[in-house]
Amino acid sequence: MHKDSNIIEELIFSFAQLPGLGNRSARRIVLYLMQDKEVRIKNLNNQLTSVLNNIMECDYCGNLDVVSICNICRHSERDSSIIAIVESVADLWALERSKVFKGWYHVLGKTLSAVSGNDAINSLKLPKLLNRIREYKVQEIILATNSTIDGQMTAFFVIDYLKDENLKISKLASGIPLGGELDYLDEGTLLAAFKARQSHDLL
């Protein structure tokens, strides 16, 4: 195989590693870029370089922004008495698109499983969450983890971690099917889940 072919195959392989893409979709993307490579590839390269150099994780919640405190955490009209705990930035963005939540967020970054060790637990940044709860006198925590086994396990771990705090802890309820992920739910389903959220005592 020619060297140029190897380069293209490596690019296809890289795209195929992205969530939601397989080899067929990756090939289509590469062929699309190659149809006008001087413009399309240069534009993509510039955009990726800009993201690499400018986008960072919010010091407070874990969202992505061009500054260390994201627009949501800076917004004076957000309800600082309530924090929704989500698994990923994708879930945070899904809730923002739905416009069903006007409080703050905490992005866990991952979930726990039955074999998770201390490194996985520490990566959830729960001490940072606890400091924020105490500093801003947060009154309610909404567990907006996905309805998967790992999501449920993570939710129960967070409940146990915060059990000594004077907090209302609730969890998204009806409308989210077992195994469902927030990023794939429509606005009506998310709204129903927020309105029908349950106290952790009922879980």
UniProtKB/Swiss-Prot annotation:
Swiss-Prot/TrEMBL keywords: DNA damage, DNA recombination, DNA repair, Metal-binding, Zinc, Zinc-finger
Top-level lineage group: Bacteria
All residue ranges annotated as the Toprim domain in the record: 81-177
Pfam families, alphabetized: RecR_C, RecR_HhH, Toprim_4
GO MF annotation, one: zinc ion binding
ZnF endpoints (C4-type): 58-73
Gene Ontology terms: biological process: DNA recombination; DNA repair
Gene3D superfamilies according to UniProt: 3.40.1360.10, RecR Domain 1 (1.10.8.420)
Family matches, as SMART domains: TOPRIM
Coiled coil (residue ranges): none
Its biological purpose: May play a role in DNA repair. It seems to be involved in an RecBC-independent recombinational process of DNA repair. It may act with RecF and RecO.
HAMAP family: RecR
Protein family according to the UniProt entry: Belongs to the RecR family.
Protein name in UniProt: Recombination protein RecR
Organism: Orientia tsutsugamushi (strain Boryong) (Rickettsia tsutsugamushi)
Gene: recR
